[in-house]
From Swiss-Prot:
Function field: Acts as a nucleation-promoting factor at the surface of endosomes, where it recruits and activates the Arp2/3 complex to induce actin polymerization, playing a key role in the fission of tubules that serve as transport intermediates during endosome sorting. Involved in endocytic trafficking of EGF. Involved in transferrin receptor recycling. Regulates the trafficking of endosomal alpha5beta1 integrin to the plasma membrane and involved in invasive cell migration.
Any one GO CC term of the record: autophagosome
Annotated segments matching region Required for WASH complex assembly: 1-54
Protein name: WAS protein family homolog 2
Length: 465
């Protein structure tokens, strides 16, 4: 016969060893015991074989990791004594698959040996007769589960009880001409008198709802302290960095590369949003204004000869249209005005008294003409005085060039002066033409006011010469 196999296994459990039933015949009990022991031997063999396979797999993984460690250690020992800088390129992500392999049980795919077909055994002995006394004696030794849970008592109902099945509307639940639901609370109510008599004791106890106590700020008249709001804005702070005073080069240090130089400005700092300090701007010397006066005197002190009328006079008038109405004077007066503007020396009284901003050369020229009194007040100079003044100015230029020869800005200014002379068509040794003088006057700044002299004496000297 085939023994009855009882399943006492959990969900997901692969193996289930059969139990031997009590009160079996001798031959039947021996057969079931032999079958259970064989089944247990197969199960234990399968379990230990799977554990051995898992241990071998883990041992191979540990061996592969050990080989990687030994290889890395050999590389480290190779570069350990080197004094050259080595760049190490590392991946931005951890070297692992995006999705890890899920854990699998070692009993995955195992089959239950008990499902295999086993041989059938024929037993010749007969069943024993049922003995009720022996069955009662077994009840004393084995616990029997008896339900001893007390039945719940019916709670006292306040209303009429459950709803009847023949009620067709909600109004049938209410007392006549009232809003009292008798199935919920049973009361005696006279619709005409309005008096209510409660029958249940619990209905007589009325609970008064009281308000909660007032807060301490009202009851004790205490003023709450104003809480300072917390600031959750991010304020980066570099903190205090210790200053280390070490030499810039330390030779023959073990494990330190000597062919690598670090630059402080390689990238943004650790706190790029922190308010940085504004770098100090370089200061410039204001010595440029002094050679500028020399250039102005150069350009102003080269007037055209007085006898013929100067041809560039119409150019000046055309280049400065917003002149006052006094510009419509004869050509002779224009020549006199050119002479007066070109001879701006310390002996001239009508020179401009203020130096205008050098940003606009033509505007300053017109302003100086207006301050000098226009063309009508121009003064004529003799040829001898102009030649003497020209020699003095050349000597002053040479002295200043020698005294300021090492200054970068003065050298640059002298080069610009020479370039202007070359563009205007006059070299360093050639005489200056009237066109170049007026062009330079228009691009320059008027000089500072010289010491004033009596106008009458100046007029007499000019006319006598």
């Amino acid at each position: 016969m085939t023994p009855v196999r009882m399943q006492h296994s959990l969900a997901g459990q692969t193996y289930a060893v059969p139990l031997i039933q009590p009160d079996l015949r001798r031959e039947e009990a021996v057969q079931q015991m032999a079958d259970a022991l064989q089944y247990l031997q197969k199960v234990s063999g399968d379990i230990f074989s799977r554990i051995s396979q898992q241990v071998e797999q883990s041992r191979s993984q540990v061996q592969a990791i050990g080989e990687k460690v030994s290889l890395a250690q050999a590389k480290i020992e190779k570069i350990k004594g080197s004094k050259k800088a080595i760049k190490v390129f590392s991946s931005a992500k951890y070297p692992a698959p995006e999705r890890l392999q899920e854990y699998g049980s070692i009993f995955t795919g195992a089959q239950d040996p008990g499902l295999q077909r086993r041989p059938r055994h024929r037993i010749q002995s007969k069943h024993r007769p049922l003995d009720e006394r022996a069955l009662q004696e077994k009840l004393k030794d084995f616990p029997v589960c008896v339900s001893t849970k007390p039945e719940p008592e019916d709670d006292a109902e306040e209303g009429l009880g459950g709803l009847p099945s023949n009620i067709s509307s909600v109004s049938s639940l209410l007392l006549f001409n009232t809003t009292e639901n008798l199935y919920k609370k049973y009361v005696f109510l006279d619709p005409l008198a309005g008096a209510v008599t409660k029958t249940h004791v619990m209905l007589g106890a009325e609970t008064e709802e009281k308000l909660f106590d007032a807060p301490l700020s009202i009851s004790k008249r205490e003023q709450l302290e104003q809480q300072v709001p917390e600031n959750y804005f991010y304020v980066p702070d570099l903190g205090q960095v210790p200053e280390i005073d070490v030499p810039s080069y330390l030779p023959d240090l073990p494990g330190i590369a000597n062919d690598l130089m670090y630059i402080a400005d390689l990238g943004p700092g650790i706190a790029p949003s922190a308010p940085g300090t504004i770098p100090e701007l370089p200061t410039f010397h204001t010595e440029v204004a002094e050679p500028l006066k020399v250039d102005l005197q150069d350009g102003v002190l080269t007037p055209p000869p007085p006898p013929p009328p100067p041809p560039p006079a119409p150019e000046v008038l055309a280049s400065a249209p917003p002149l006052p109405p006094s510009t419509a004077a004869p050509v002779g007066q224009g020549a006199r005005q050119d002479d007066s503007s070109s001879s701006a020396s310390p002996s001239v009284q009508g020179a401009p008294r203020e130096v205008v901003d050098p940003s606009g050369g033509r505007a300053t020229l017109l302003e100086s003409i207006r301050q000098a009194g226009g063309i009508g007040k121009a003064k004529l100079r003799s040829m001898k005085e102009r030649k003497l003044e020209k020699k003095k100015q050349k000597e002053q230029e040479q002295v200043r060039a020698t005294s300021q020869g090492g200054h970068l800005m003065s050298d640059l200014f002298n080069k610009l002066v020479m370039r202007r002379k070359g563009i205007s068509g006059k070299g360093p040794g050639a005489g200056e033409g009237p066109g170049g003088a007026f062009a330079r006057v228009s691009d320059s700044i008027p000089p500072l006011p010289p010491p004033q002299q009596p106008q009458a004496e100046e007029d007499e000297d000019d006319w006598e010469s």
